[in-house]
From Swiss-Prot:
It is a multi-pass membrane protein. Probably functions as a manganese efflux pump. Belongs to the MntP (TC 9.B.29) family. Keywords: Cell inner membrane, Cell membrane, Ion transport, Manganese, Membrane, Transmembrane, Transmembrane helix, Transport. The keyword tRNA processing does not apply. It is found in: Cell inner membrane. This is Putative manganese efflux pump MntP. GO terms for cellular component: plasma membrane. GO terms for molecular function: manganese ion transmembrane transporter activity. It comes from Xylella fastidiosa (strain M12). InterPro entries: Mntp/YtaF, Put_MntP. Pfam families: Mntp. The lineage of its organism: Bacteria, Pseudomonadati, Pseudomonadota, Gammaproteobacteria, Lysobacterales.
Amino acid sequence: MSPITILLIGIAMSTDAFAAAIGKGAAIGKPRLRDALYVAVIFGVIETATPIAGWLLGQIASHYIAAFDHWIAFGLLSGLGIHMIINGLKNNGNTCKDNADTHNRNSRWLTLAATALATSIDAAAIGISLAFLDIHIGIVAAVIGLCTFTMVIFGVMLGRVLGTFVGNRAEIVGGIILIIVGSTILYEHLSNTG
């Protein structure tokens, strides 16, 4: 897998967290860099750990399904991409202002961790699909974590100004990227076998 593909996966995996961070930034009102760093560390650590957990699970099952692993990777990535696009389109009517009271009540680290875990489920699925490829999961997980950390900082700081408009669009773009990556994996495998 090329470094560009790994970076695209990192960016795609961080879009859910970016969207959540925009909501958090909108709820804080006037976020400081310290607020953004706090949220980014929690999201970044969890987003780094979940693809590793998924990869470990995938490693256990990989020798049973090696003959069609590329189809699994394609299906998971494309399915996640479609899901992200649908969520991005569904949430277009929501505003961060509507959710501000909830965010203010639930700003403790445990709630942030739960939100980070919820937004990183797709990263766990990515980890499962990467178990079927010849790739170093530590590098991919680190890139996902760093992309998430960076995008969450920007999301929190931009949240008050941008609201959910950009957050929803980011999720749509992330979904498109995942579909492209899944299609590329399938194409590369099929072109190497034929």
